[in-house]
Amino acid sequence: MDSVKTRSTMKAVVYFVALMLGSAWSDMAGECDMAGFYMELGCTPLPRPDNSTACPDAFQCPDLHPDPSMCYYRGVPYGDRSTIPQALINNPCSQACRCTVAGEPRFECAALDCVEVFNGDLQQCVRTYELESCCSTGNVCGKDAIASLKTCEVDGKTYMEGESFEPKNSHKTCICTGEWNGTTDNAAYCRDINCGIEIHYQEKLLDNCAPVFVGDRRRCPIGFTCPSATTRVVRGLNVRGVNSECVFGNRTLSVGDEVTADACTTCACDVPPFVSCMMKNPCPNST
């Protein structure tokens, strides 16, 4: 039991250090594949052999489950039916998250039904958001009212005051305001994206499954894929000479190795220690 407590304390320290690194981590998350994913899990980048400042080849992660009978969030263990204090959750879409230990431990959260999900486009209206809200908080309707709003030019697109957007090459979500100046380091209108990986995919992490991404691996994963009876590892060539390895289920892979998934998804050991997958969108073989 003491060893479990020690590992939990060490993991919490890792999370504290990651938080102290602040903007440097955030910049890396927006520019480097898998960095945001690993940052959220409290992992740290391993130094490159050439000591360059290029994107990390691999990360070192704390033990995500020192005790497999507990849920873990940001290094803190939660027993069955324990709830994460809302002030500790950095994702406004994750509310009232409680640990459930039935089989493998996992978190269950309250379902949030945003009106924009059920009522998509509003004619002559702009949906407005607040930085710490999950759903839209209001509407601005009518030509004159909309014309009076400030605008933000971001990545070739125009956003109206109150609209949310995610700038390219960043791991941030922002709200268009009159103070927007093209930078994302102002906490008044931008915050780091938190994918809620430990909250929504607790059991997948425990089983050493692989995150699945669409578009690029600098955004949040859309899910995980896990080993199955038909999983096959195709050995590749480690052209970068990375010594770190990936773990997929109970299998160990070298950088360059690939894992068979399905016709729409390709998985590989690229940035250890997790295998990562890319899903085609759209998939030509989907029905």
Which residues does each predicted region cover?
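Extracellular secretome segments
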Residues: 2-287
